[in-house]
């Protein structure tokens, strides 16, 4: 693992914040938490579901995401991509949907997944938790709506090579049902 992206999560502090026992932070995005890296935010998210989960991941993604899945002691189910959008498709996800518990859907180079709404609906119907990897995409639109507004769970990285650059850091946004 790249040393700069090794997750460092204060689980007790975060759990106290989630349960409302910690300090209150005024966020404009509800249910959002900030971390030292995008990898830390993803690790925290995966750990909410325990270990040994089957995590769907497209083959063209940052190697740090794969490292985090392994750190969480989960199993990776790799999925192919569409070469025009650099992301997986509805048809590919549908083939794997019964063999995954969580789907990490990466949106790369500012291009949202063109099948996003269908994939999200499929995940909801099959009980698969969907989290959007928005580390390379900020305020991309689908049907006139920002991807962030359509997504229930997503994470950012604020490393120097990302759309929102702050040298380091990350953010996780949780859905209401995971937050409460």
Range-by-range predicted roles:
Residues 134-166:
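Conserved active-site segment immediately N-terminal to the catalytic lysine
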Residues 29-30, 52, 73, 100, ...:
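Short, well-ordered alpha-helix to beta-strand connector turns
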Residues 35, 81-84, 160:
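Short, acidic/glycine-rich phosphate-metal binding loop used to engage nucleotide
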Residues 47-125, 129-134, 138:
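PLP-dependent aminotransferase-like
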Residues 163-180:
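Conserved core segment of the aminotransferase class I/II
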């Amino acid at each position: 693992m790249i040393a700069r992206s090794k997750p460092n999560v204060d689980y007790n502090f975060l759990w106290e914040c989630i349960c409302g026992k910690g300090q209150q932070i005024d966020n404009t995005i509800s249910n959002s938490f900030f971390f030292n890296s995008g990898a830390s935010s993803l690790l925290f998210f995966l750990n909410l579901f325990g270990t040994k989960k089957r995590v769907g991941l497209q083959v063209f993604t940052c190697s740090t995401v794969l490292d985090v899945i392994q750190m969480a002691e989960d199993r990776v189910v790799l999925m192919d991509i569409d070469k025009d959008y650099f992301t997986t498709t509805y048809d590919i996800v549908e083939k794997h949907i019964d063999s995954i518990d969580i789907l990490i859907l990466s949106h790369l180079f500012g291009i949202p997944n063109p099948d996003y709404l269908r994939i999200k609906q499929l995940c909801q119907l099959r009980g698969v938790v969907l989290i959007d990897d928005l580390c390379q995409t900020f305020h991309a639109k689908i049907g006139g709506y920002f991807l962030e507004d359509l997504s229930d769970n997503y994470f950012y990285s604020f490393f120097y090579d990302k759309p929102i650059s702050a040298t380091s850091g990350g953010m996780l946004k949780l859905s209401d049902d995971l937050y409460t």
